[in-house]
Every structure is written in structure tokens, then in C-alpha cells.
Amino acid sequence: MNRTPPYHRFHRAMALLSLSLLPLLLLAQSNPGRASTNATATYPIVDTGQTNCYDDTGSAISCPAGGQPFSGQDAQHNGHQPSYTNNGDGTITDNNTGLMWVQAVSSKMTYAAALAGAETFNLAGYDDWRLPTIKELYSLILFSGLDPSGCQSLSQCPDIVPFINTAYFDFAYGDTSAGERLIDAQYWSSTEYVATTMNGDATTFGVNFADGRIKGYPSEPVGPPGQQFTMSSFVRYVRGSSYGVNAFVNNGDGTITDQATLLMWAQADSGSGLNWEEALAWTAQKNAENYLGYNDWRLPNAKELQSIVDYSRAPAATSSAAIDPIFSVTPITDEGGSVNYPFYWTSTTHANWTAVPGQWSVYIAFGEALGWMQPPTGGDYVLQDVHGAGAQRSDPKSGNPDDWPYGNGPQGDVVRIFNFARLVRDAAPEPVVSHTIFLPTLAGSSPPAGR
């Protein structure tokens, strides 16, 4: 006769069951290096919308097959396609991010006014609007746009296209009749630069939807006494759950998974500078090598690469690149002889309005976004952080940097051409395996009532 109390018999059965399941539990933990991706992205990266392929001379080309020069560029990989809903009440919902945006173009205002305006802004019955972060604002950019830099008026370049979907969002170029440049269509974000730009200017990042760039802009009065001015930019308020927060996991095998975007990154970078064609070819080479166990790496598009910028970091503030230290970053000696961090290529062409639109490609500055500025009184050019670590600009795809001794554009953006690269791939969800576990049936093994 079994005199073991029912309570003890139950727990003995559970102990035996635990031992029988131990191999399964160990198997489930045997590969901690592969982060589980059985989840929906909380930070979905909206595709750039770029559909044309280009070579390095600026010509549009048929998208090349694998193994051919210039294969692997932005137009050859489709991510979350842009999708919006017009709510009919002055608001637009992004169906990928879930964010709700103001449809209309605001008047231009200072950064302080933009912050204050959000506190009292009310539209469509909502009063929880905010100034977007730089990652929220950048989610709207589309690289189907054409940069009008150098164009003086819409009559000179009537076929230009903004870097935002104007079927849903109202848009205006700079008012040339009021002395503005056509490209003066900057929008404030709420992301303040943790260092300073120019001559110690307090700086806040913004997106220019006319020329397709992220730059840091002066957010407080600048200029000599008696001649100070405060920059004004457009504002597009947003509401909804937070967007743009990474969830990095070190897989312990040279890869980093962002469980928020469901992208897997190479922990190390290219280790040296490459021109754009070389960066694409290097990516293909790594796939041929089955680098880190995968053969589906790609050069990230502009929005994918910007997603891993850490805007709480900057060389002058944290003595580091603007990226989570979970990643390895090769330091460089910059044009002024100082230790700095690289620009990184993307697969995205920065197309412009000229007859050869595709000569330039997008990069993200993970080090200082340097430029050569001449003092207002003249004299030698001075190398400065003009746009902030985390800026998105562009470089010629090929050529000699020595041909650009004082950079490019109104802030003398340094031209390197030989930028670094970091690989990305989709972190495919792991298959969900369903196990049916049969519990042992023991007489009297049910737990006693009340226990």
C-alpha cells in the first residue's frame, strides 16, 4: 500500500518532469549568441522609397545583377514601404510607425517657440502633440527626392521633388522672393546636440526636406553683439507612442541584433576607407566569404544606418563616436590632425536636379561633421564641427579628396570620398517550434485542494 501523502506524490512527479525537460531547457539556452527575434518591430524602419539605380558618374542605370559593379544599392532592397492614411482632419497617420503627424506646413519659428508651441497646440481634438525627435522626424524622409542645391528658383529647376510625400504632407520650399534660398526648408526636431557646432553654438538637429539632409542648426542667438540673429525653421508636430528607441543585443559572435528594428549588424566596421563602388564590392565579398555565418549582408540604406546613431554621444562630449559602445568603431585622424571617427557610406544615392543626378551618395557622420569655414572678417579657413556628429550629408561616389581642399557647400563640408562601411542584414524571426508535452499520470498525483 502506498502510504506516501498525495501532496508528496504530486511534487515527486513534478520533479521527475523537470528532470525530463532539462535537456530541452538546456537546448533552448545552448545558443545564447542568437537573439530571439520572434517579435514585431517596435522601431520599424520605413523604406527610403528609392527605386532608381545609379553608377558613380551620375547616370541612372538598370539595377545590376549580383556580382556586377554597383550591385547591392538601395533600390535593390525593399523594406517597409511608405504607407500613410489621411485622417481627413488635418492629420496624417504613418501606417508603419503608428505616429500621427500634422499635415499642414507651419510658419517658421525659433527653436524655443517650437518647443513652447507644442505645449498649447491642439488639432483634431488632440492636445498631446510634441516636437518630434530626430529619429521620428527622419522616418518621414524619402530619397525619391531631388536635391535642388545650386538652383536659384523653381523656374530654373521645375522638376525638383521634395524628400517627403507631398500627396499626404503639405510642403514649401524656401521663399526666394524674401531672400531665402530654395533649400531653406529645414524642420526642427527636439534632439539637441550634446556638444556644440561652429564657434560654440548651442545646436539642435533638424531635417531639411528640400535637400534631403540632417544637420545641426543654431538653436540660440548667434553672431557678434548688435548683429545677432536667431534661426527660424518649420515645425511639424507629432503624437503617439515613442519611436526610435533601440534594443541592442550582443550575440557574442561578432553580430549585434537590434530587437527594436529587427536588423542584425556587424559589430566591426570595414576598418579602412572605401569609395562607394568599393563599399558595395566589399559587401559582396563578405557575402562570398559567408561572413560571420551569413551570406545576405547588405550595405545599409540611409534610414537603416541612421537608426543606430546614438545622439547622446559625440566626440567632444563623450570622447566617442555617436554610436552605442556595443559596436566597434575604427578611429581616424581627421583633416585637422585630431583623433576622430569616420563617416559611413549608405547604399542610398543622394540624387540631385542636374543632368547627372547620381554622382553623390548619402553618408552618416558618426564622428564630427566637419567643415572648412572662413571667418567673417576673412583669413585662413578653419576646420570646425559644423553640423554635429549624427548628421546625414553626402559625398561624391568617386574621385580625389584633394580636389576639394575647402570642402563643399556653404559650410565647407569636408569631402572624404573614402568612407567606412558597416554591414546589416534582416534578423529573420526564428521558427516557433510547438512541443506537446505529455505529463506522467500517477495515481493520486493531483495536488490536494487548498495547497
Predicted segments, located by residue:
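Bacterial N-terminal signal peptides that target proteins for export
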Residues: 2-18
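Glycine-aromatic-enriched surface loops/turns that form tight recognition elements
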Residues: 29-130, 134-298, 303-433
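Conserved functional hotspot residues at active sites or interaction interfaces
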Residues: 440
